[in-house]
From Swiss-Prot:
PROSITE patterns: ANK_REP_REGION, ANK_REPEAT. The keyword Repeat applies. The lineage of its organism: Viruses, Varidnaviria, Bamfordvirae, Nucleocytoviricota, Pokkesviricetes. SMART domains: ANK (SM00248). ANK repeats lie at residues 6-35, 39-68, 71-100, 103-132, 137-169, 174-202, 206-238, 242-271. Keywords: ANK repeat, Repeat. PANTHER family: ANKYRIN REPEAT DOMAIN-CONTAINING PROTEIN 39-RELATED. Pfam families: Ank_2, PRANC. This is Putative ankyrin repeat protein FPV234.
Length: 428
């Protein structure tokens, strides 16, 4: 760092030597803390670079501008990049602009893309706009949080969501969901964001869902991401604006066979999927392609075996087959009741039905989770609507009404109830 006069030299030396006493004396004797040296680099920038919190505090106390930037990054942006929570707090206390944009990014965008949730909390405390767009792609802080591949990313995502960030907010320019930013999609990430209201089948540009986008991206580790998404309910049969399903965009290779197995299994086990236009198109491709069509007979054989594979817990459902259980969503309560029996038989099921195992697992998981949500909402409504017409309805009718709601609505109702409970607790 080049300097121009004796005071600048002494200030630089004091900062770099972490000599707070000398720095205090120099500043009290009238040295200018805002002197810009070549390239508009300031003493405040130098102190932040050295992570010298004492020097930052002294410079600010003696009049250093917390928003000084010039050619370089504003001090608050720099402190966030360096991971200095205490320095960032000092800057904010002395008037750093919390929503100042620099090269298209505000402090909250940078903080969300780091591994330190404390800085995100600090910025929110000082009024950061958690739903502000960046100046380049119109991405939001939640998009930047999703980019982080780190065990701590869930903490950052939680902080943002707890303070009102929209998990389904799509970027302005590319019209993609926050989930698209993630290069490593994991079970724990999907479980969490879905529980917080994420719609993983939301459509963006050209009517594409997350599977369309990831298949077109065709990047490193993307097939693993595709499988994790499918396991959590991403729709392989969804049609985009051009009439393409995600499967239609996938290269014909070994991975496509895995997807074909899944699609054919879904065809035989799910009536809703079977009658969709996307499924019809996917099945046409599989039937016409010699490389893929061999999986149809393999899946058919496993489906026939499912029809004779009895699920019996020793007490009831003696004549119920695995196929009957999976192919009828009305059996949701039975799935829940037999969950322990099914868990015990899972290794046997995997051995007998290797090609259908993924869809078997997913249907059981989906039905179990759905039943748990229905039970919870049923209990909430019964507790809160005692003196209403709802409570006068027969139990069977109440249950039938609730089962007409899709999973997304059920999750949103539970989230709303949780939010209301938190608000009521705060009032008390």
């Amino acid at each position: 760092m080049q300097v121009r006069n004796k005071d600048d030299i002494l200030i630089c030396e004091a900062i770099e030597n972490y000599d707070s006493e000398s720095l205090r004396n120099i500043l009290e004797n009238g040295a200018d803390p805002n002197v810009r040296v070549p390239y508009q680099y300031s003493h405040l920038h130098n102190a932040i670079e050295k992570k010298n919190g004492s020097a930052v505090s002294l410079l600010l106390k003696h009049g250093a501008d917390p928003n000084i930037s010039g050619f370089f990054t504003p001090p608050l942006h720099k402190a966030i990049k360096k991971g200095c929570v205490d320095i960032a707090r000092s800057l904010l206390e002395y008037g750093a602009i919390v929503n100042l944009e620099h090269y298209c990014l505000k402090p909250i965008h940078i903080a969300a893309n780091r591994t330190e949730s404390k800085i995100v909390k600090l910025l929110i405390e000082y009024g950061a706009d958690i739903n502000s767009e960046d100046g380049a792609n119109g991405k939001y802080p939640i998009h930047y949080a999703m980019k982080v591949y780190d065990p701590f990313r869930l903490k950052i995502i939680k902080v943002l969501l707890d303070h009102g960030a929209d998990i389904n907010k799509q970027s302005v320019l590319t019209n993609t969901s926050p989930l698209y930013e993630t290069r490593f999609i994991t079970d724990d990430l999907l479980d969490y964001i879905i529980s917080r209201g994420a719609n993983i089948n939301i459509k963006g540009r050209m009517g594409r869902n997350i599977l369309h986008e990831i298949i077109l991206r065709n990047g490193y580790n993307d097939f693993s991401n595709i499988l994790v998404l499918i396991d959590h309910g991403a729709d392989i049969n969804a049609l985009d604006d051009e009439g393409n399903t995600p499967f239609m965009l996938h290269t014909i290779n070994n991975n496509a066979i895995i997807l074909a197995n899944y699609i054919v299994s879904l065809y035989y086990l799910s009536y809703k999927a079977r009658i969709s236009n996307g499924m019809e198109k996917n099945m046409k491709i599989i039937n016409k392609c010699e490389y893929l069509s061999s999986c149809i007979n393999i899946i058919k054989e496993e489906i026939e075996r499912m029809k004779t594979f009895k699920i019996y817990d020793g007490n009831s459902f003696q004549d119920l087959s695995l196929f009957d259980l999976l192919s009828n969503e009305d059996n949701i309560a039975i799935v829940y009741r037999l969950s322990d029996t099914l868990l015990e038989k899972m290794n046997i099921i995997k051995t007998i039905f290797p090609n259908c195992f993924r869809i078997i697992q997913n249907i059981l998981k989906m039905l179990t989770k759905r039943y748990e949500m229905l039970l919870e909402i049923n209990n909430i409504m019964n507790a809160n609507l005692v003196n209403t017409k709802w409570y006068t309805l027969p139990i069977e009718i109440r249950w039938m009404i609730l089962t007409k709601l899709d999973d997304m609505i059920l999750r949103n109702l539970l989230l709303q109830n949780e939010t209301n409970n938190i608000k009521n607790c705060k009032k008390q």
